Amino acid sequence: MARPVSDRTPAPLLLGGPAGTPPGGGALLGLRSLLQGTSKPKEPASCLLKEKERKAALPAATTPGPGLETAGPADAPAGAVVGGGSPRGRPGPVPAPGLLAPLLWERTLPFGDVEYVDLDAFLLEHGLPPSPPPPGGPSPEPSPARTPAPSPGPGSCGSASPRSSPGHAPARAALGTASGHRAGLTSRDTPSPVDPDTVEVLMTFEPDPADLALSSIPGHETFDPRRHRFSEEELKPQPIMKKARKIQVPEEQKDEKYWSRRYKNNEAAKRSRDARRLKENQISVRAAFLEKENALLRQEVVAVRQELSHYRAVLSRYQAQHGAL
């Protein structure tokens, strides 16, 4: 149904612009005049936000919708509606933009709250080997691998310092744990020296009780071939003593003095002979124990060498794949 001529809004009022303006800018000037005429006094606190929303709504208002068409000042019909006015030409309420929340790029992100994580400690917690140093160079001191904090955007204001961030204290604890791990690894790499006399080889050695009786001094502790140690003087070769030439003494000269001296010499020779035989028995029993222990240790050395060659092959493959340690 056609409207009366008096109810129609003249096109030059909305679409027409002042003299000298381009024909495409009439709709923009008419919409701006309508917005400025219907705007209410704004509060100072929300002035900046409303100004941004109005600037964002201007390009959307000039774009034709799916059911509207914009026409120039020459061919605009009498009942055309431009911008946000009423069909009769009266200024209506301006449609608010669809998104009232602040824009994503205008938000202030907490870039200062960045937690620092030690890379070696993280790998050790998850059962992974630490990162090897670069090959060919000296091993640098372990330094915590910190995540670089991104530079704050132009909209962020007064971001907190990394030192005052709440995640910095757990990071220090993680660094302390990692340093303690490295100290423990270093102490295990260089073990303390071991006294060879305190090492006992697990073996079964049961000497003959008769040999132990011949190797022990009567009235003293039983000889133990496992723990007995001979001195250097005892282990030296003993010289062969030549037997003294026998002197024939006539019967008439064999008095009490002669028999007393001969008795003492026989006792000394017997004591020397018993001591020599005792030492020989001890050395023989000790040598039997050492021979058996030596055979067992040789087998252990062969097993250790095989294990060492296996570990060296594993280490060489690791260095070929990941570089030198």
From Swiss-Prot:
The main place the protein resides is nucleus
Where is the stretch described as Basic motif?
Answer: 257-279
What Gene Ontology terms describe what this protein does at the molecular function level? DNA-binding transcription activator activity, RNA polymerase II-specific; DNA-binding transcription factor activity, RNA polymerase II-specific; RNA polymerase II cis-regulatory region sequence-specific DNA binding; RNA polymerase II transcription regulatory region sequence-specific DNA binding; sequence-specific double-stranded DNA binding
State the residue spans of region: Disordered: 1-99, 127-200, 229-255
The record's gene field reads: DBP
Q: What is this protein called?
A: D site-binding protein
Query: One Pfam match, by short name?
Result: bZIP_2
Residue numbers of Phosphoserine PTMs: S86
Composition bias, Pro residues: 129-153
Identify the Gene3D superfamilies for this entry.
1.20.5.170
Cysteines engaged in disulfide bonds, as pairs: none
Subcellular localization, as worded in the UniProt entry:
Nucleus
Family membership noted in the UniProt record: Belongs to the bZIP family. PAR subfamily.
PANTHER family in UniProt: D SITE-BINDING PROTEIN, THYROTROPH EMBRYONIC FACTOR RELATED
Record's Gene Ontology CC terms? chromatin; nucleus; RNA polymerase II transcription regulator complex
Question: Which residue intervals are annotated with compositional bias (Gly residues) in the record?
Answer: 17-28
PROSITE patterns per the record?
A: BZIP
Q: Where is this region: Leucine-zipper?
A: 283-297
What keywords is this UniProt entry annotated with?
Answer: Activator, Biological rhythms, DNA-binding, Nucleus, Phosphoprotein, Transcription, Transcription regulation
Source species of the chain: Homo sapiens (Human)
Question: Subunit arrangement?
Answer: Binds DNA as a homodimer or a heterodimer. Can form a heterodimer with TEF.
- Enumerate the spans annotated as bZIP domain: 255-318
At the highest ranks, the source species' classification is: Eukaryota, Metazoa, Chordata, Craniata, Vertebrata
What role does this protein play? This transcriptional activator recognizes and binds to the sequence 5'-RTTAYGTAAY-3' found in the promoter of genes such as albumin, CYP2A4 and CYP2A5. It is not essential for circadian rhythm generation, but modulates important clock output genes. May be a direct target for regulation by the circadian pacemaker component clock. May affect circadian period and sleep regulation.
SMART domains recorded = BRLZ
Q: Where is the composition biased (Low complexity)?
A: 29-38, 57-80, 157-167
- Which InterPro entries has this protein been placed in? bZIP (IPR004827), bZIP_sf (IPR046347), PAR_bZIP (IPR040223)
Give the tissue specificity. Answer: Ubiquitously expressed. Expressed in the suprachiasmatic nuclei (SCN) and in most peripheral tissues, with a strong circadian rhythmicity.
